[in-house]
Amino acid sequence: MPLSKIKTNSLATGSITSAIMPTGSVLQVKFGKFDDDIANTTGTEQDVLSLTITPSSTSNKIYLTSHAQISSITRYHHIKLYRKIGSGSYSQIAFGDNSSETTRQTAWYCCSTGEVTGATYMQTNSAGFFLDEPATTSQFTYKITAGASSSSITGYAFTVNSAHYHGITQAQNQWWNTWPITTLTAMEIAG
């Protein structure tokens, strides 16, 4: 691969401006982590973490990655991704087309341990990836939520960043338990 030359007139006070960066360049990275734990006894959707980012151009895209640690002795759990522009309201993004099967829940990614032997002690590490095209230079916020696949489902308790132990949805300070993190990363990509 040939080397590229940076023109001196492209430099501003010793730095490379984002306007000069080629398409596909990473212009900024925002990272959020949730290093506490959540004990949810009902399965209802719950906020996990959020971050804000302000694109430098309307043509730029935002590449999002996330991984979450969920534990449960039941099933149907997922992560949803939401976006809010400025002080507006959140809208769900990054989900499949359920227009022909409207009973199915929309989600960014699933992270259920399922009802299997030993699921009580399992922590599932699941990940999601998404390229967003917000077409704005306003500040906006991304957030992820965890929950069961229906607001009408109750009793599908889960934990985030902790093992779910025999139906007790609280952090267990035991040698066999771990305390991982759940993350959300947003990268502005030159368009």
Residue ranges of predicted features:
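Short, surface-exposed loop/turn motifs at beta-strand boundaries within globular domains
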Residues: 14, 25, 44-46, 57-59, ...
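Extended, low-complexity regulatory regions
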Residues: 49-53
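Terminal beta-strand-rich extracellular "head" domains
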Residues: 33, 38-41, 56-139, 143-191
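Tryptophan-centered short beta-strand motifs
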Residues: 3, 24-26, 42-45, 89-92
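Glycine-rich, low-complexity segments
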Residues: 2-37, 191
